[in-house]
Each structure stands twice: as structure tokens, then as C-alpha cells.
């Protein structure tokens, strides 16, 4: 019988949204159009039109000794061409952002190949070959995973995910990488992801309305759908907590040694 991954436990809308993100067979809804050159500008790793820098020759030109992995694993395009490793990093507001760090990590690992991802409380980085990174970044910025007001592209100085919004509903950004254009109603990036001024602004589109964000968010919140409303999720979390506590501390395994260290008899 073929294995069908569940992706994420839970019976609520929040759980279903998480499953949609992680499921590579689910087509993420495209919400905006961003030019490839604009994505390159915001990433800040190279200039539009500039060739990709490489760190080794194309794989087909390299002389490999016996290495079974090269026959087992199909390299991604950037690896084939030898392009360098680069990154994009997001900060997601805890106030109903479409994605959040652990959701991003699991989504990246399910959907993309050749990725290295790091998870922190208020930011999520994805590193991969630059050629492939730009293609992945386009997906992450144009689809329902991203909202220009609640998600920030921040390679440095990421603070703001837990802070209140400004008067235009934008998440706080200490480097002020983006602004709200009152004429168009769109969020516009005026700096790249590490805070360097751009030669020309990049339009990221209109922020999603609050009602829609509550429908697509992957964050449990008391003022939307609380975690305690999801019985299946709570059951899984409790099982993991119990297994880690009992098995992780290994109280039974080290019972005699622990008793001796506490001054008791070594039975």
C-alpha cells in the first residue's frame, strides 16, 4: 500500500492551510506578478542582467572519482552550472501572516530540492544555489505564502514580527526597506533585503484584507482559531511532549546512576 503523507495534524482551517503549503501536489494560488529583474534587485546578490558567479566548473566538466551519489541524485540546475550559494530570508508577523517560520521550513523541505533552511522564532532563511534561489523566490513572493504587509524580506535586522503595525498596517522594519504608497495602495520596496537603497522601487502589490488573512493564515490565535480548538493537534502535541520528556530525560535508563548521585543506595 502506498504511503500518503498527512503533512500536518489537525482538523481546523489552520491545519488545512499548513497542509496546503507543504503538499507539493497542491498548486499555490498566485496573487501578484513581480518581474524577475525586480526579484533580483530585492535579493541584492547580483545586478539585473549580471551573470551568475560560480564557485566551481560545471559538473559535466569535472573529473569525479568513484562517487555513487552522482548517479543516484539528480543535481539541481544551479549545482550543474556551479553557481554559488545565496539566500532569501523572511520575517512573518505573528498577527495572521500567511506563513510562519516552522511552516516555511517544512514547506521548503517538501516542495524544493537542494535547500538548506534555518528556523528561528521571528525569521526563516532558505539557502540554495543562486540560480535556483531566484526561481524559488518568485514562487514565495507571488503566491499566497506571502503578504507584502505581514511578511518582510529581511536579510539582516529582522526585528518586528511581534510588534504592532504602523498607521498603514505594515509590520515594523527598523531599516525601513518598504513603504506604503498611498496613491496606489501598494507596498513598495525602496531597499534590498539587507537595507541597501535601490536604484528604482519595487512594487510588491496590495496588502491582503484582514478577513482574507484570517482565512489563509497558518498561525493559531485566540482571536481567530485557537490551538485548543483543534483536538487532533493537541493529541499529537501531547504525545510528542510525553515521549520527549520520558524518553529524552531517560529516567528509567539512568535510574540507578541518578539515585547513587543523589546519595541513595545503588540498587
Swiss-Prot record:
First-level EC class: transferase
InterPro entries to which the protein is assigned, alphabetical: Me_CoM_Rdtase_Fd-like_fold (IPR009024), Me_CoM_Rdtase_gsu (IPR003178), Me_CoM_Rdtase_gsu_sf (IPR036994)
This protein's UniProt keywords: Methanogenesis, Transferase
Annotated pathway: One-carbon metabolism; methyl-coenzyme M reduction; methane from methyl-coenzyme M: step 1/1
Cofactor note: Binds 2 coenzyme F430 non-covalently per MCR complex. Coenzyme F430 is a yellow nickel porphinoid. Methyl-coenzyme-M reductase is activated when the enzyme-bound coenzyme F430 is reduced to the Ni(I) oxidation state.
GO molecular function: coenzyme-B sulfoethylthiotransferase activity
Keyword Transferase attributed: yes
Catalytic reactions on record: coenzyme B + methyl-coenzyme M = methane + coenzyme M-coenzyme B heterodisulfide
Superkingdom as given in the UniProt entry: Archaea
Residues annotated for coenzyme M binding in this entry: 123
Enzyme Commission number, as recorded: 2.8.4.1
Cofactor(s), names only, from the UniProt record: coenzyme F430
CDD domains: MCR_gamma
Gene Ontology biological-process annotations: methanogenesis
Transmembrane segments: none
Known function: Component of the methyl-coenzyme M reductase (MCR) I that catalyzes the reductive cleavage of methyl-coenzyme M (CoM-S-CH3 or 2-(methylthio)ethanesulfonate) using coenzyme B (CoB or 7-mercaptoheptanoylthreonine phosphate) as reductant which results in the production of methane and the mixed heterodisulfide of CoB and CoM (CoM-S-S-CoB). This is the final step in methanogenesis.
Quaternary structure (record): MCR is a hexamer of two alpha, two beta, and two gamma chains, forming a dimer of heterotrimers.
Family indicated by similarity: Belongs to the methyl-coenzyme M reductase gamma subunit family.
Protein name: Methyl-coenzyme M reductase II subunit gamma
Organism: Methanothermus fervidus (strain ATCC 43054 / DSM 2088 / JCM 10308 / V24 S)
Lineage, opening ranks: Archaea, Methanobacteriati, Methanobacteriota, Methanomada group, Methanobacteria
Amino acid at each position: 500500500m502506498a504511503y500518503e503523507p498527512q503533512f500536518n495534524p489537525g482538523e481546523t482551517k489552520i491545519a488545512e492551510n499548513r497542509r496546503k503549503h507543504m503538499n507539493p501536489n497542491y498548486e499555490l494560488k498566485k496573487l501578484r506578478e513581480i518581474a524577475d529583474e525586480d526579484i533580483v534587485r530585492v535579493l541584492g546578490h547580483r545586478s539585473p542582467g549580471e551573470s551568475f558567479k560560480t564557485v566551481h566548473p560545471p559538473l559535466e566538466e569535472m573529473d569525479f572519482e568513484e562517487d555513487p551519489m552522482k548517479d543516484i541524485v539528480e543535481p539541481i540546475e544551479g549545482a550543474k552550472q556551479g553557481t554559488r550559494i545565496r539566500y532569501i530570508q523572511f520575517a512573518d508577523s505573528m498577527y495572521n501572516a500567511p506563513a510562519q517560520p516552522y511552516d516555511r521550513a517544512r514547506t521548503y523541505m517538501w516542495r524544493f530540492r537542494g535547500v538548506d533552511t534555518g528556523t528561528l522564532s521571528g525569521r526563516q532563511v532558505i539557502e540554495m544555489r543562486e540560480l535556483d534561489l531566484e526561481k524559488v523566490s518568485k514562487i514565495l513572493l507571488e503566491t499566497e505564502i506571502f503578504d507584502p504587509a505581514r511578511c518582510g524580506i529581511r536579510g539582516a535586522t529582522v526585528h518586528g514580527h511581534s510588534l504592532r503595525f504602523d498607521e498603514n498596517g505594515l509590520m515594523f522594519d527598523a531599516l525601513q526597506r518598504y513603504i506604503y504608497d498611498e496613491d496606489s495602495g501598494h507596498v513598495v520596496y525602496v531597499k534590498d533585503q539587507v537595507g541597501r537603497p535601490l536604484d528604482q522601487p519595487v512594487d510588491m502589490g496590495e496588502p491582503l484584507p484582514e478577513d482574507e488573512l484570517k482565512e489563509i493564515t497558518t498561525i493559531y490565535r485566540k482571536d481567530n482559531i485557537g490551538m485548543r480548538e483543534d483536538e487532533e493537534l493537541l493529541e499529537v502535541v501531547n504525545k510528542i511532549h510525553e515521549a520527549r520528556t520520558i524518553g529524552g530525560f531517560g529516567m528509567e535508563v539512568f535510574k540507578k546512576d541518578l539515585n547513587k548521585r543523589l546519595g541513595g543506595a545503588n540498587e
